[in-house]
Design a protein with these regions (language model features):
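Short linear sequence motif anchored by a di-proline
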Residues: 1-233
């Protein structure tokens, strides 16, 4: 198989957990009034991110995907979508957000793209067999332009595990449940300890990967309704 070597994440269609699902899965959690259901999220669009509030409570907050430059008057053209775990505390663009503004994006599935010899990209859907949501590490910051403000986030990436390495050289930084408190800054973890959480996630055979279907068949009458999907990677 041809593999991408640029270290950039690619792919389409991941399924966001609904607000109710995230609330049930992530207790204790406060749902803010602005955290509406998000079923589709693409770069430059919005997703709900879990973070720690000023009161020290977990909350879901809508944020736009992608960091724009601080001097860019238009945040709809972000310069960064992802950040490498290896250099997250070293690059000026990301170091402050890593130190003070860490969050979690919760999804059901995610896609990775395999670059083919003909220049096209083949999409693969990664799905956990146990059907439990996947927690992806993100960092966020507030973009300013005069009185206008906007919360934005980027996803953290790591080297791939054995499954993902078949098609690409990066994958999302997945956080096991026990890592959430330190990543969300609920504990006294140091920055070195927070960075140490960003390891390649070994799925232990729990994930399956299948080609993304190019089209969806029409559901038969009475068939269970499919959960909506959106683009994340």
């Amino acid at each position: 198989m041809a593999r991408r070597r640029d270290g950039k994440m690619c792919g389409k269609f991941t399924q966001m957990s609904s607000r109710q699902e995230v609330h049930a899965f992530s207790q204790p959690l406060v749902i803010t009034k602005d955290a509406d259901e998000v079923v589709v999220s693409t770069p430059m669009r919005t997703a709900n991110i879990m973070r720690l509030s000023a009161a020290g409570e977990r909350e879901m907050v809508p944020m736009r995907w992608g960091f724009a430059g601080h001097d860019d008057p238009n945040p709809s053209r972000p310069k960064h979508m992802h950040v490498r775990a290896e250099t997250i505390d070293q690059r000026r663009t990301f170091a402050q957000a890593f130190a003070t503004s860490r969050g979690i994006l919760i999804v059901h599935t995610f896609n990775e793209g395999e670059e083919l010899p003909n220049g096209k990209t083949k999409q693969w859907v990664v799905t956990p067999n146990d059907d439990l949501p996947i927690a992806i590490a993100v960092i966020f910051e507030e973009w300013h332009n005069g009185p206008e403000t906007l919360l934005t986030f980027v996803m953290v990436t790591t080297p791939p595990n054995a499954l993902i390495a078949r098609i690409t050289d990066r994958m999302p930084a997945i956080l096991p449940r026990e890592a959430w408190p330190a990543w969300l800054d609920e504990t006294d973890a140091s920055l070195a300890e927070a960075k140490a959480l960003l390891q390649t996630y070994e799925d232990g055979g729990n994930w399956m990967m299948a080609p993304q279907q190019s089209s969806k068949p029409s559901p038969s009458p009475g068939a269970p309704k499919q959960k909506p999907q959106g683009e994340l990677f």
